[in-house]
Design a protein with these regions (language model features):
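The feature captures the beta-strand-to-loop junction immediately N-terminal to the Walker
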Residues: 43-45
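Helix-to-loop junction immediately C-terminal to a conserved catalytic motif
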Residues: 58
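Short helical segment in ABC ATPase nucleotide-binding domains corresponding to the A-loop/adjacent helical element
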Residues: 98-106, 118
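A short, proline-enriched helix->beta-strand linker immediately N-terminal to the Walker B motif
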Residues: 156-160
Length: 313
């Protein structure tokens, strides 16, 4: 069985009650994988633990159960192998745009000469349309420009995985769309592996290869994994003309409005969070559900994954 680039198995986060009571289990038994070069979005209602999961992937927080393996190694603490972009830009206010990016590049490659650091940093700022704003301080930039700097800084260290926590949530619609296009172009050019939190189903359909649907908390878990079967080369201007678009969108909205409640607390009947179903609602004729393969048991040969087809033939 092929090894996945990122493997999340049995992840749980519990917060103890200082009064000695049972405490709060935000999520438990969270399982999913991401392949190298894949763009995965996670969607769910507030309070289900999406940002906590991202922080665990970043090494900024510790899970109370389960584990995360990236590129064959368990994640334990922050690393330059993972670039993070938060909703807030988190720029150093006393540094220029260029120096903010150079700061990360120097940390990644401490042996580089100054000219090499500057050229590398400038290239990534130009990729997000900031070639004319290299020497401006953050206070001189708009919200969209600040977020572009954060994206350039994350890409410039060439991480094995990029983690995005609602990076466009505070931006106006026009700026948001422009940066989405820039992000798509860079991801496709660099084959970057991405894990992104969003509340915007349209954004997820545009950007992602697959979408992880999270049930409501507490005791949240991955309910479904939706594969986006619309071919790559998507654009904001044309994606809604694809016949798959509204089938996928309606499926996502129905989950968020109706079906996510079925998983509250203990979970929906018959749902196994260790093997959340893979759903392809964009395909004509109905969804195809594929049970994810179980983790490899090295003492026995792996069984073939079951395939349940809900499509009409």
């Amino acid at each position: 069985m092929a090894q996945h680039f990122l493997q999340v198995e049995g992840l749980a986060k519990r917060f103890p009650d200082p009064r000695g009571q049972e405490g709060l289990t935000v999520f438990e038994n969270v399982n999913f994988t991401i392949d190298k070069g894949e763009f995965a979005c996670i969607i769910g209602h507030s309070g289900c633990g999406k940002t906590t999961i991202l922080n665990v992937l970043a090494g900024l927080d510790e899970a109370t159960g389960g584990g995360v393996i990236m590129d064959g190694r368990e994640i334990a603490g922050p690393s330059l192998d993972r670039g993070v972009v938060f909703q807030g830009h988190a720029l150093l206010p006393w540094f220029s745009t260029l120096k903010n990016v150079e700061f990360g590049v120097r940390s990644r490659w401490p042996g580089w000469k100054a000219r090499q650091v500057t050229a590398h940093s400038t290239r990534y700022l130009e990729m997000v349309g900031l070639g004319q704003a290299l020497h401006k301080k953050p206070a001189e930039l708009s919200g969209g420009m600040k977020q572009r700097v954060g994206i350039a800084r994350a890409f410039a260290i060439q991480p094995k995985m990029l983690l995005l926590d609602e990076p466009f949530g505070a931006l106006d619609a026009l700026t948001r769309g422009t940066i989405q296009d820039e992000l798509l172009a860079i991801v496709e050019a660099t084959h970057q592996t991405v894990f992104m939190i969003t509340h915007d189903v349209d954004e997820a359909i545009l950007l992602a290869d697959k979408i992880l649907l999270m049930s409501n908390g507490p005791f949240a878990k991955i309910a479904e994994i939706v594969e986006i079967t619309i071919p790559r080369g998507r654009t904001r201007a044309t994606i809604h003309h694809d016949p798959q678009y509204y089938r996928i969108r309606n499926h996502l909205v129905d989950f968020l409005v109706n079906r996510s409640q079925d998983y509250a607390g203990g979970g929906a009947e018959g749902h196994d969070p260790r093997h959340p179903p893979v759903v392809r609602p964009g395909l004509a004729g109905g969804a195809t559900l594929v049970a994810l393969p179980k983790p490899v048991d090295h003492s026995n040969p792996p069984a073939s994954p079951a395939v349940l087809s809900h499509a009409s033939h």
